[in-house]
């Protein structure tokens, strides 16, 4: 139900023309002075529990009337507040019940404008800060109108030895940047993050002006990095025992469970109308996977069930001013795994395993991660030794946040973050223990004749693909010679012939290396060798080989290795072709491979930006 409450000098209405849904015997003309006018729309989802919605609405109206010291109340049906209305019968029943219950208190004079009539009205709003209020009433939990719990937050740092420390002892370095942000003492930093310029100058990603803000166009060099990262997560999840699925990007808000889950995210959604159905674009893959789990026949001996989807795309309607580069988008790619566990003991075990995946992703991306563990006080008191064990296994200090009560679907979670070039966290991998969604979506199994709604783990082993690339680019700010891990480099080897007579040899070598699954291109442009070498450096190519007479005669290649180089001091090694192949394969061992996404001859390569 949607309410718009207006503190009015006066409200006057007059019924003009009835519709097919019109109430019989209306009061055709009426009004009130010094009143609280309650414009009301009853929604389709309210029909799940009309009594509960009415009770919540009455409580909200009474609360506002008390704040404003108002005794006159006028209930005004106003369909324009919602695009997903209930049946007329349900609406009349709800409006009549609200009117009746308010009258029964004996504290108010209550009137109700007729339902199903076109009406003209005049209203004067008082214009003070509380004179215009809007409320959304959610059936069932009543989350929209319940008083918010007073939740306190306690922070401390736990070291791998299990000792507890004050946060003030850990305010330096990357971990210190996370601590300062979480406890609210980080100093504001101006300017764009470093990656915003890099993503364009390296021809990875660009803004798409013809789309909504926060939607990007992926260029070939960026597309291959994105696809390799997606391959990486898929391989990781498959090795872990996950089962890939694919689910829709849009969902019907008429489904109560979906409506309630979506409503927790407030206005950060893309909502639209499809015929008579009120729809939304997903902001995570939860909806589809929970729907699959709800329809499954689950036996205790099949648990845990680990379900995975690369959510391409998920959508969040972030504030325009908050959208920036690859860090905060309105459309993004999220590797999303949900694990249905037997019980809490099973959930804790899966949590440990999935946290290891998160730490491993940082190692494989050559990006240092720092962590914060969050949980309710009740959880911490019960599982303190377990918390100490996961910090010990992580081998680094972790910030601990203790919430006095549960305010989300999770009772415990860990967030791992990279730190950008300006000292700001980029939250990436996460694991969460969800104790709410299996009940909401009716995901269950039976044990000893009892229905069990088990805990569900939410896990993104890497965080969004876009934020991974953001972290990789930001990481270069701390490198003396900026580079991506070799397995992610759009071009892994670049061949630079000195003269035209060397091009044929270089071309044959290029073919051989590409067949060996090494992304290799050939700079056959009519430019100086010096310029070609400089541009290979600007492209962050890990291995650069200049080919002249000596290379053709001896077969020995002078390879500049970027990872071992220093500014103005290139590291060079003499290698034959097989040694080169072994070197590159060793540096990319165990990582996914894709062939070149750009033309291998640079003379034919277009510029994208």
Curated annotation (Swiss-Prot):
It comes from the Archaea. Its main location: cytoplasm. The keyword Ligase applies. The gene is thrS. Belongs to the class-II aminoacyl-tRNA synthetase family. The keyword Heme does not apply. It catalyses: tRNA(Thr) + L-threonine + ATP = L-threonyl-tRNA(Thr) + AMP + diphosphate + H(+). Residues 1-145 are annotated as: Editing domain. The N-terminal domain is an archaea-specific tRNA-editing domain that hydrolyzes incorrectly charged L-seryl-tRNA(Thr). Catalysis of tRNA editing is performed by the charged tRNA itself. This is Threonine--tRNA ligase. Its EC number is 6.1.1.3. Keywords: Aminoacyl-tRNA synthetase, ATP-binding, Cytoplasm, Ligase, Metal-binding, Nucleotide-binding, Protein biosynthesis, RNA-binding, tRNA-binding, Zinc. It comes from Methanosphaerula palustris (strain ATCC BAA-1556 / DSM 19958 / E1-9c). InterPro entries: aa-tRNA-synt_IIb, aa-tRNA-synth_II, aa-tRNA-synth_II/BPL/LPL, Anticodon-bd, Anticodon-bd_dom_sf, DTD-like_sf, Thr-tRNA-ligase_IIa, Threonyl-tRNA_syn_edit_dom_arc.
